[in-house]
């Protein structure tokens, strides 16, 4: 359900057109992604895993931001990110991230669990990079009805 939600809200024709229109109408828009998937957030909360950064992820985020030459400190209120690391972006907005030299070898082998890894820290980075570079970030959800699959409400 989560993958369907992300793919539909990123790649369905209506979502693509809405996203392209948003970028065309706002030259300072740097990153667009669907709203955080509600069932994922509920599952994380139930498991005791915060949807904002853990202390391990926070430390990795600070290191990555420093590596890119950008201010790293941030408030939890800035934790607005794409769960699943699937989004549209303006290349100039994320240039430091694209050039920071991350390699495949920097990431642990799968399965990686639900938090505390470089992949989870990296998931939270794009909006921070965009805003530090003067770009805006927004969520755009064209198909909110697929947030909760029908079987969730059956007895």
Label each region the model flagged.
Residues 1-155:
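ER/Golgi luminal nucleotide-sugar-dependent glycosyltransferases, focusing on the catalytic module
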């Amino acid at each position: 359900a989560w993958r369907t939600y992300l793919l539909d809200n990123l790649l369905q024709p209506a979502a693509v057109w809405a996203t392209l229109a948003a970028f065309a109408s706002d030259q300072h828009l740097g990153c667009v992604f669907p709203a955080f998937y509600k069932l994922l957030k509920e599952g994380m909360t139930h498991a005791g895993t915060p949807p904002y950064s853990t202390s391990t992820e926070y430390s990795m985020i600070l290191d990555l931001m420093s590596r890119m030459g950008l201010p790293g400190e941030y408030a939890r209120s800035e934790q607005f990110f794409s769960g699943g690391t699937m989004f549209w972006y303006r290349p100039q907005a994320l240039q430091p991230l694209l050039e920071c030299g991350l390699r495949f070898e920097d990431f642990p082998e799968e399965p990686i669990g639900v938090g505390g890894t470089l992949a989870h820290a990296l998931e939270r980075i794009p909006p921070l990079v965009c805003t530090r570079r003067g770009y805006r970030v927004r969520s755009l959800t064209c198909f909110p009805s697929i947030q909760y699959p029908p079987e969730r409400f059956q007895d």
